[in-house]
């Protein structure tokens, strides 16, 4: 990749504190809409503590209510997101990054994933570890652009397109235990499936195939440090970063997308707070 989409003006939006998960996905849709209309590209960071973000397929689990009850008993809330197909674990040690830029139907899905892969490689280049993009089949939310080191997954990427804008979203497991997060999801699927055969194949999770970056890099690493690595990498790849305030028109548009998220989740009657 040439890094060409990184060259030029980007708005940096720091949402690492103070938001609920449904707000995050609503903001990404709003920024997609605006970027599609010609606004500057956006890089947005977000952190949510103790919540499982379920995918569309998870909403069809035969014993979803029991699975949600298990998560709640473990101190985790749950919501259904508007991108991606399966559940992921978020907590204070997981940094989410959204790259939001303009793109039409000719812009391939893989190209969007490659840009995020390029960015993450730049962020952690100094550690000298090879980061691979390939499916880790026994991880939670497996996909062809799972990011791993030595076969252990630390990140997953999803993509959403709204009104001519593209949001490529990644979760980076930075601090803590990757295998403990994976074990939470393994138990969730065990409870929510109860061994039933379904048309959709849910992941058969092996907790040992997931790890955090501080485990894989064998060094102490914090979300705050990685935020600085992100901004430095964006500038290295050619981005000019700025911060802009929300306007009244932006809030109006945001509220439209937020209402859609509320409607999607209200049908499930699940505990979002844990």
From Swiss-Prot:
EC number(s) per entry: 2.3.1.204
Residue numbers annotated as active site: 141 (acyl-thioester intermediate)
Keywords: Acyltransferase, Transferase
MF terms (GO), sorted A to Z: lipoyl(octanoyl) transferase activity
Record domain BPL/LPL catalytic: where: 37-242
Keyword Cell inner membrane: no
Top-level class of the enzyme under EC nomenclature: transferase
Site feature (Lowers pKa of active site Cys) residues: 153
Biological-process GO terms, alphabetical: lipoate biosynthetic process; protein modification process
Keyword Coiled coil: no
Reactions catalysed, as given in the entry: N(6)-octanoyl-L-lysyl-[glycine-cleavage complex H protein] + L-lysyl-[lipoyl-carrier protein] = N(6)-octanoyl-L-lysyl-[lipoyl-carrier protein] + L-lysyl-[glycine-cleavage complex H protein]
Pfam families associated with the record: LplA-B_cat (PF21948)
CDD domains: LplA (cd16443)
Gene3D superfamilies: Bira Bifunctional Protein, Domain 2
InterPro entries, per the entry: aa-tRNA-synth_II/BPL/LPL, BPL_LPL_catalytic, LipL, Octanoyltrans_LipM/LipL
Known pathway: Protein modification; protein lipoylation via endogenous pathway; protein N(6)-(lipoyl)lysine from octanoyl-[acyl-carrier-protein]
Function: Catalyzes the amidotransfer (transamidation) of the octanoyl moiety from octanoyl-GcvH to the lipoyl domain of the E2 subunit of lipoate-dependent enzymes.
Family: Belongs to the octanoyltransferase LipL family.
Any further remark recorded for this protein: The reaction proceeds via a thioester-linked acyl-enzyme intermediate.
Protein name listed in UniProt: Octanoyl-[GcvH]:protein N-octanoyltransferase
Organism encoding this protein: Macrococcus caseolyticus (strain JCSC5402) (Macrococcoides caseolyticum)
Gene that this polypeptide is encoded by: lipL
